[in-house]
């Protein structure tokens, strides 16, 4: 079966590769339709590793996906051939302590698509547990279905924040995940969300959503912008979504006393944190790693029409041009939010 393979750092190829396609009793086989290009996919392409996860052998990329069920296992009663679906890419050990606690996203044994050594799904077909597969409502397109995965991260962040209706939030970093967090925070009850970045094009994209206030920190300090928006009280919630070490310096200057800081962006190296400032304000600190028990909620919110992710899809490529999609993503064009790859017509 032909797939997009990361051979090693900086080298991609479209080639035949043997992938596991045996359908177990609790599995579904899916004809992949749309796959999003994630920042982690690009990082593996450009750097060959993310932390301790190192590409040591050829690996198929892609984990943000939607498609159509073509075969079901003997025990599967909730799906049938022809069902349109999206898939949660992380499958934990269902007997693990983390899973039993409901925090399967931090299960050390989780198997996550396109995370070494596990193959991703930029290929015509994939087999996946039915328990981590979700039907797409009729009004949700394949393109939107492939956006559920990154939006679930935003939903996890909003959930960890414990939003109270009317809260004012700040999102540091206007990348794809930052915008997802802002939209999830608004859907969760925030009255407005300030989102900061140096990139005017990205801020312009975010600003098209009602309730999102862009702050260009190349022109104005975030501290001043938040002070003006909150009568110098500070934001109820601050989401750090950039992963930039410099961003951590101001976090406790923009959060209100008794507020919350939610860390989502993953720095490459350890960063300094102003613990005395956090303690003096009694700030609650939360962290986010992927998501758990929230994929279906993210899908339901998209289906409700309360969150429209379609404007964030800034480029679509045929599977034959998927290397070009990754080359474009690696350039970091400021006008791009989410690129997607279509596998329609591929038959293996």
From Swiss-Prot:
Describe the reaction catalysed, as an equation.
Answer: xylitol + NAD(+) = D-xylulose + NADH + H(+)
PANTHER family (alphabetical): SORBITOL DEHYDROGENASE
Cofactor(s) for this UniProt protein: Zn(2+)
Q: Which GO terms describe its molecular function?
A: D-xylulose reductase activity; zinc ion binding
Lineage runs: Bacteria, Pseudomonadati, Pseudomonadota, Alphaproteobacteria, Hyphomicrobiales
Entry keyword set = Metal-binding, NAD, Oxidoreductase, Zinc
Kindly list the residue ranges recorded as spanning the membrane.
none
Protein name from the UniProt record: Putative D-xylulose reductase
Concerning its family, UniProt says: Belongs to the zinc-containing alcohol dehydrogenase family.
| Residues engaged in binding Zn(2+) | 38, 63, 149
Q: Which residues form a coiled coil?
A: none
Cofactor, free-text remark: Binds 1 zinc ion per subunit.
The main enzyme category here is: oxidoreductase
Identify the EC number(s).
1.1.1.9
């Amino acid at each position: 079966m032909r797939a997009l393979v990361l051979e090693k750092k900086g080298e991609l190829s479209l080639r035949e590769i043997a992938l596991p396609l045996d359908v177990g009793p609790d599995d579904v086989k899916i004809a992949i339709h749309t796959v999003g290009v994630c920042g982690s996919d690009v990082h593996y392409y450009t750097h060959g590793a993310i932390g301790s996860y190192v590409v040591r052998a050829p690996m198929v990329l892609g984990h943000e996906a939607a498609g159509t069920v073509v075969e079901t296992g003997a025990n599967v009663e909730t799906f049938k051939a022809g069902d349109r679906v999206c898939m949660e890419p992380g499958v934990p050990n269902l007997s693990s302590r983390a899973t039993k606690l409901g925090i399967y996203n931090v299960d050390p044994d989780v198997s996550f698509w396109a995370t070494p050594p596990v193959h991703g799904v930029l290929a015509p077909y994939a087999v996946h547990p039915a328990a981590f597969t979700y039907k797409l409502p009729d009004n949700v397109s394949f393109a939107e279905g492939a956006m559920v995965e990154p939006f679930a991260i935003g939903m996890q962040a909003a959930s960890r924040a414990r939003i109270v209706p009317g809260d004012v939030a700040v999102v540091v970093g206007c990348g794809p995940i930052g915008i997802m967090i802002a939209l999830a925070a608004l859907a969760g009850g925030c009255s407005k969300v300030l989102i900061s970045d140096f990139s005017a094009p990205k801020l312009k994209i975010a600003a098209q959503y009602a309730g999102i206030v862009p702050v260009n920190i190349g022109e104005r300090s975030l501290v001043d912008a938040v002070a003006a928006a909150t009568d110098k009280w500070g934001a109820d919630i601050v989401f750090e979504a950039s992963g930039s070490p410099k961003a951590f310096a101001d976090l406790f200057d923009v959060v209100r006393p008794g507020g919350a800081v939610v860390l989502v962006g993953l720095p490459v190296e350890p960063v300094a944190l102003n613990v005395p400032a956090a303690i003096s304000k009694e700030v609650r600190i939360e962290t986010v790693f992927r998501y758990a028990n929230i994929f279906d909620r993210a899908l339901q919110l998209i289906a409700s029409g309360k969150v429209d992710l379609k404007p964030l899809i800034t480029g679509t490529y045929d599977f034959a041009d998927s290397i070009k999609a990754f080359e474009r993503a690696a350039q970091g064009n400021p006008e791009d939010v989410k690129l997607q790859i279509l596998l329609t017509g591929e038959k293996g």
